[in-house]
């Protein structure tokens, strides 16, 4: 399995050194009394920028006109991923932070949360409400079920991330604990809590998860992925 592109210490330094921002969108009435700095974007009567740059402009509104402020973070160190160049299907409501890698024809469903440093292989689906913690790695053509959690590891920096191989199916609401590796071709049953490494081509289930069988033709048929869902 591949190593993460950013190790824990690099992510820690990225966050520590990042300019912390409280990004806002402000709709206002009337006219601004002062010039708009280059750090703020003004489109008509709407301002986009960091609150520390926008707030002084609002204090100078002519005749104390009203304004409305929209914000979704405070002193954020990591922006959301710019998805425009990603060759994947990403549905509304997915929260994906910067420094995440997403392979071709992957699918990210509504409500999925993907933290900094995570890697998602080509053709892999991250289902509704699934969580990939910091530095979690999922291989190609895998499926992480709805509500499943791949625990993240950014601190302590010495800890190993979760690594999931190719052609793996992780059932709904399963939890994979920090540092665990899931071998290629394996299946994690719904609701399982995986606390130890899983070899290739087996089915694990339970709390804590145990191997219950090896992958057979019937299991492969039941867990086969649908390529049509990954068509762009």
Curated annotation (Swiss-Prot):
It comes from the Bacteria. Pfam families: DapH_N, Hexapep, Hexapep_2. Keywords: Acyltransferase, Amino-acid biosynthesis, Diaminopimelate biosynthesis, Lysine biosynthesis, Repeat, Transferase. InterPro entries: DapH, DapH_N, Hexapep, Hexapep_transf_CS, Trans_hexapeptide_repeat, Trimer_LpxA-like_sf. GO terms for molecular function: tetrahydrodipicolinate N-acetyltransferase activity. The keyword Amino-acid biosynthesis applies. Gene3D superfamilies: Hexapeptide repeat proteins, Malonyl-CoA ACP transacylase, ACP-binding. GO terms for biological process: diaminopimelate biosynthetic process; lysine biosynthetic process via diaminopimelate. It catalyses: (S)-2,3,4,5-tetrahydrodipicolinate + acetyl-CoA + H2O = L-2-acetamido-6-oxoheptanedioate + CoA. It is an enzyme of class 2 (transferase). Pathway: Amino-acid biosynthesis; L-lysine biosynthesis via DAP pathway; LL-2,6-diaminopimelate from (S)-tetrahydrodipicolinate (acetylase route): step 1/3. Its EC number is 2.3.1.89. NCBIfam families: DapD_Ac (TIGR03532). PANTHER family: 2,3,4,5-TETRAHYDROPYRIDINE-2,6-DICARBOXYLATE N-ACETYLTRANSFERASE, ACETYLTRANSFERASE. Catalyzes the transfer of an acetyl group from acetyl-CoA to tetrahydrodipicolinate. Belongs to the transferase hexapeptide repeat family. DapH subfamily. This is 2,3,4,5-tetrahydropyridine-2,6-dicarboxylate N-acetyltransferase. It comes from Streptococcus pneumoniae serotype 2 (strain D39 / NCTC 7466).
């Amino acid at each position: 399995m591949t190593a993460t592109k950013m190790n824990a210490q690099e992510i820690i330094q990225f966050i520590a050194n990042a300019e912390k921002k409280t990004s806002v969108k402000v709709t206002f009435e009337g006219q601004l009394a002062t010039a708009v700095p280059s750090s703020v974007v003004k489109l008509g009567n709407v301002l986009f920028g960091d609150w520390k740059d926008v707030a002084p402009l609002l204090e100078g509104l002519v005749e104390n006109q009203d304004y409305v402020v929209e914000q979704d973070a405070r002193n954020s160190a990591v922006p959301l991923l710019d998805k425009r160049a990603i060759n994947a299907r990403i549905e509304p409501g997915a929260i994906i932070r910067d420094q995440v890698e997403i392979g071709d024809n992957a699918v990210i469903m509504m409500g999925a949360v993907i933290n900094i440093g995570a890697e998602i292989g080509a053709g892999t689906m991250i289902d509704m409400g699934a969580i990939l913690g910091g530095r979690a790695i999922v291989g190609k053509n895998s499926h992480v079920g709805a509500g499943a959690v791949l625990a993240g590891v950014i601190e302590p920096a010495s800890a190993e991330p979760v690594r999931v191989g190719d052609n793996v199916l992780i059932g709904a609401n399963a939890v994979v604990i920090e540092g665990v590796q899931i071998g290629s071709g394996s299946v994690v049953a719904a609701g399982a809590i995986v606390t130890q490494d899983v070899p290739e081509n087996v089915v694990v289930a339970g709390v804590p998860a145990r191997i219950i069988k090896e992958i057979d033709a019937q299991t492969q048929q039941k867990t086969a992925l649908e390529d049509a869902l990954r068509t762009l």
